Amino acid sequence: MTKFTKNKQEKNIIITIKRLGINGEGIGYYKKKIIFIPGALPNEVVVAKIVDRHPHYLEGELVRIKEKSPDRVTFPKGVDPAVGGLELAHLSYPKQLEFKQHLILESLRKYHPRDYIKYKVKKTIPTPNAWNYRNKAQYQIEFNKGKSKLGLYAPNSRRLIDLPDMPTQTKETQKVEREIKKLIDKLHIRIADFRRHTDGIKTIAVRQSNATGEIQVTLITIGKKIKDLKLLASHIMKLPNVVSVFQNETQWQNPQVWGNKTIKLFGKSHITEEILGKKFKLSPRAFFQLNPEQTTTLYSEALKYLDLTPDQTLIDAYAGVGTLGILASDQVRQVIGIESIPEAVIDAQENCRLNHVRNAEYIQGNVEKLLPELKNQGVPINALIVDPPRTGLSKKLIKTLLEVKPETFVYVSCNPATLAKDLVLLSDAYDVRVIQPVDMMPQTPRWEGVTKLVLRKNK
C-alpha cells in the first residue's frame, strides 16, 4: 500500500463528499477521478489537499470543512485523529450502524451471488457500549530522540502515535500498558529498534478477562535474551489484577506481530473468560473476540440460526479455543472441532474438561483435508459452522463443502467482501436465508456478521 507523500506544492481543492468507502474514508470526485479523504462525511463540502496520486484514484487530506454533515459528532479529545482504530469516531453511532449494513449490501451488489437481491440483510445489532469495549490492548513501543513512546502506528506508516488514552480500550488495560512503559524506562530495559534491527521489547500485549478481571501480559521481543526481562516481569506481576507475564519471541523478518514461541515468565498459564454460562481458558496466543459483551450477542445469533437438533453432528471449523462448539454442545449429539493451531486445540480440549463437555472432540489440521476424511469414516456432517479469518474460505474448502454438502451451516464473517465473494460459489448449492450484521467494533469500519445457508433441495 502506498505511503502518504504530502506535496506542499499541491493547491487546496473543494470536494463534495458522495459516500463512505470501505475503510470509512469520505469519497468524492476531482476532475472525474475518485478521491479518498479520511475524516470527511457524506454530503459535506470540504477543503482538501491531494497527498498522493495514483493512475485511477487520488488520496486526499482534509484541510477544513465548509459545509458540515448533521451526522458529524465531536472526535475524542486528546487523541491524534491519524491513529488507527477510530476511523468512524466522527460519525454518529446510529449512522455507523447504517454504514455497516450498507457495507454488506454493497459487497453483494459488487459480486452478485445467485439471487442476492432476495437476501434478507437485517439491520446491524448495536453493541451495549460504543466506548471502552476492547479488553485487549496491543501497543508498540519504540525509543526515538532520547525518549520512549508507546501506542499505535498511523495507518500505512511506521510513525508511532503516543497514546496516553485510547477511548475504545478498557481503562484497566490502558493503565497497565502505561505502567509497564514506566517500568521499562525506570529499569532501562532494551527496546527494539526497527531502524537498526536491534533486539529488545517491540510490543506489549495486555488482555483482561471480562468475567474475572484477571490481566495477562505478554512482552513481544525481538530476540530471546533481553537483559533484566525477568526483573521487569517480576515488577509487572505486582500491578493490580496482573496474574501472568509471558514472553513471545519473534524476528524482524516476521510480518506478523506475534512469533511462534511463547514462554511463561511468571504466574498462571491462562486467564478465564465466560460466555453464555461457559468458561474458556485463554493462553496468550489464543484468539478471542475483543468485545466480550457483544460476543455474547454474536454467538447467540450464530446458535439461533444454526437451529440445531439433538440428533445432529456439528462440525466447528476454524474452532479456535472451542468457543462456538462448546456453546452448542448441549444442543447436539456430537461436536467435532477442527483447528490448525496446535496450542488452540490444546486450549479447546482443556475448555471441554473445564465445562464438563463429553460430546466434543477437537482435532488439529486443515478443514479442507479433514472434512472428506470424516465423511469417509461415516461421520454424518449435517451441521457446520465456519468462522474464518478476514481472507474468507479458500476455494479448496468451498469445493470440499460443495462435495460434503452439510444440510445447514452458519458462516461467521469478519469481512463483507470475502463473504460476498464466497457466496458466489456457495450459492450454487445453498440458499442464503439471512445475513445479520453485528457491530463488534464501534468507531471503526470493521464488520462482523452471521449468515445462515441451507442446502437447496433440488441439488
UniProtKB/Swiss-Prot annotation:
Record-stated family: Belongs to the class I-like SAM-binding methyltransferase superfamily. RNA M5U methyltransferase family.
Which amino acid positions bind S-adenosyl-L-methionine, per UniProt? 289, 318, 339, 387
Q: What class of enzyme is it?
A: transferase
Q: Kindly give the InterPro entries that the UniProt entry links to this protein.
A: MeTrfase_TrmA_AS, NA-bd_OB-fold, SAM-dependent_MTases_sf, TRAM_dom, U5_MeTrfase_fam
GO MF annotations in UniProt: rRNA (uridine-C5-)-methyltransferase activity
EC number(s) stated in the UniProt entry for this protein: 2.1.1.-
Keywords for the protein's UniProt record, in alphabetical order: Methyltransferase, S-adenosyl-L-methionine, Transferase
Identify this protein by name: Uncharacterized RNA methyltransferase LJ_1606
Q: Which Pfam families match?
A: TRAM, tRNA_U5-meth_tr
Q: What species does this protein belong to?
A: Lactobacillus johnsonii (strain CNCM I-12250 / La1 / NCC 533)
All copies of the TRAM domain together span: 6-64
Where are the catalytic residues?
A: 414 (nucleophile)
Q: Name one GO biological process term.
A: rRNA base methylation
